[in-house]
């Protein structure tokens, strides 16, 4: 409300809120700039539909598992968001892939793997030292896998509405067949969506039924394996560990859950009141026998102890005279050991002397043989020299005449 002293002044608006006006902005701030529109052909104008964008990203969330945007310094590389041509469903979102999404994801992954293998084949040469899974073999396997995916005929079987109907393929296919039959009856001559060709009779419709018994067997085997796994986990949870000290746990390591339940039921039935009196009487008799056995065992143990003590005493008595002579025997053994060592050394010296004597004898024989040869050679040379001197004397005599 306005101040009461201004209530009677002319030009005052009554029963209205107070308005406080400010002065205009400076001239520099009052300038208005017209935004120029970009008319260049190099700039691409994108028309954004907010409603379509909202519907596309509705109920979507960004997975931050394993991401690190911190500025810490370390050897490990920081991991940020990664995106590709085809975005898969993230883990932990609580959304299950539909068969159509699985089919598209498998086709996309096979295509990427095929591209990578083609790049490897152009750079890597085949050799005998390669690994078992060569790029050529891997490419063949990829082609077979892609052919198997294409052979599933998912798109042909369910049409463009597969993304909706593939959550229940059998039900969707049955509904589509019924709709086509109704349309055929109404049109009388129209062909169904699954006809392989135009039949001779326009009132007939031919359908192809693609049966995959291997897939059915695999699904059945997977269900059986899952059931066996759950049953094994249940048996493991119910089964108790074997304890040798606890007689109640004896025999509870059964092969299956039924055997364990039967054993537990038998043990529980043994605790009935009608049976406990009989069990108590038997336990009393067994306890008396156990006490008698304990007394007898104590007497037997005492007798065994006394016999062992007597044996030890006799052994000590026999050992006393031997113990007195043991130091002398040890001294003699030490002396004999030294004598044996000296005798061994003397034997080695004799062996060396004998070997040296044999070497000297062999040398003497060789020298004798050489001396004989030298003497023979000297005699021959002396005879030759004497003959030469005689011939020289004869020549001198002849020359003197």
UniProtKB/Swiss-Prot annotation:
Organism domain of life: Eukaryota
Name listed for the protein in its UniProt record: Dynactin subunit 2
Molecular functions per Gene Ontology: identical protein binding; protein kinase binding; spectrin binding
Family in the record: Belongs to the dynactin subunit 2 family.
InterPro entries attached to this UniProt entry: Dynamitin
A GO biological-process term: mitotic metaphase chromosome alignment
Entry keyword annotation includes Acetylation: yes
Location(s) in or outside the cell: Cytoplasm, Cytoskeleton, Microtubule organizing center, Centrosome; Membrane; Cytoplasm, Cytoskeleton
Reported function: Part of the dynactin complex that activates the molecular motor dynein for ultra-processive transport along microtubules. In the dynactin soulder domain, binds the ACTR1A filament and acts as a molecular ruler to determine the length. Modulates cytoplasmic dynein binding to an organelle, and plays a role in prometaphase chromosome alignment and spindle organization during mitosis. Involved in anchoring microtubules to centrosomes. May play a role in synapse formation during brain development.
In-chain residues carrying the UniProt-annotated modification Phosphoserine: 83, 320
Membrane topology: Peripheral membrane protein
Residues annotated with N-acetylalanine modification: 2
Modified sites of kind Phosphotyrosine: 6, 86
GO cellular component: a single term: cytosol
UniProt-listed Pfam families: Dynamitin
Origin species: Homo sapiens (Human)
Coiled-coil region: 99-132, 214-244, 379-399
UniProt key word Flavoprotein: no
Record keywords: Acetylation, Coiled coil, Cytoplasm, Cytoskeleton, Dynein, Membrane, Microtubule, Phosphoprotein
Modified residues (Phosphothreonine): 134, 198
Region ranges (Disordered): 1-25
Assembly and interaction partners: Subunit of dynactin, a multiprotein complex part of a tripartite complex with dynein and a adapter, such as BICDL1, BICD2 or HOOK3. The dynactin complex is built around ACTR1A/ACTB filament and consists of an actin-related filament composed of a shoulder domain, a pointed end and a barbed end. Its length is defined by its flexible shoulder domain. The soulder is composed of 2 DCTN1 subunits, 4 DCTN2 and 2 DCTN3. The 4 DCNT2 (via N-terminus) bind the ACTR1A filament and act as molecular rulers to determine the length.
């Amino acid at each position: 409300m306005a101040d009461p002293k201004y209530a009677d002044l002319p030009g005052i608006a009554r029963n209205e809120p107070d308005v406080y006006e400010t002065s205009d902005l400076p001239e520099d701030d009052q300038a208005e700039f017209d935004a120029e529109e970009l008319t260049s052909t190099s700039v691409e104008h994108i028309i954004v539909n907010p409603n379509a964008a909202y519907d596309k990203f509705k109920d979507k969330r960004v997975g931050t598992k394993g991401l690190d945007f911190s500025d810490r310094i370390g050897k490990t590389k920081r991991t940020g968001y990664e995106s590709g041509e085809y975005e898969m469903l993230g883990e932990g979102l609580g959304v299950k892939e539909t068969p159509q999404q699985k089919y598209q994801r498998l086709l996309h992954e096979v295509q990427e793997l095929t591209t990578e293998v083609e790049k490897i084949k152009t750079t890597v040469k085949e050799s005998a030292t390669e690994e078992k899974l060569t790029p050529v073999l891997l490419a063949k396997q990829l082609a077979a896998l892609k052919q198997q995916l294409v052979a599933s005929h998912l798109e042909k079987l369910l049409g463009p509405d597969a993304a909706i109907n593939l959550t229940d393929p059998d039900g969707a296919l049955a509904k589509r067949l019924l709709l086509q039959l109704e349309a055929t009856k109404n049109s009388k001559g129209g062909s169904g969506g699954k006809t392989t060709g135009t039949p001779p009779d326009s009132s007939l419709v031919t359908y192809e039924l693609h049966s995959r018994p291997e897939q059915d067997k695999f699904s059945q085997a997977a269900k059986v394996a899952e059931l066996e796994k759950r049953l094994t986990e249940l048996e493991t949870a119910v089964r108790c560990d074997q304890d040798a000290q606890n007689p109640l746990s004896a025999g509870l390591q059964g092969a299956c859950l039924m055997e364990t339940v039967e054993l537990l039921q038998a043990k529980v039935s043994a605790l009935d009141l009608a049976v406990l009196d009989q069990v108590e009487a038997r336990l009393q008799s067994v306890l008396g026998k156990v006490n008698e056995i304990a007394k007898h065992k104590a007497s037997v143990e005492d007798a065994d102890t006394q016999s062992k003590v007597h044996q030890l005493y006799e052994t000590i008595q026999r050992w006393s005279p031997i113990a007195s002579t043991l130091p002398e025997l040890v001294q003699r053994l030490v002396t004999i050991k030294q004598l044996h060592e000296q005798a061994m050394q003397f034997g080695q010296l004799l062996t060396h002397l004998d070997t040296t004597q044999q070497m000297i004898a062999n040398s003497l024989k060789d020298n004798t043989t050489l001396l004989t040869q030298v003497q023979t050679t000297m005699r021959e040379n002396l005879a030759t020299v004497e003959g030469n001197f005689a011939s020289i004397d004869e020549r001198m005599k002849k020359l003197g005449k």
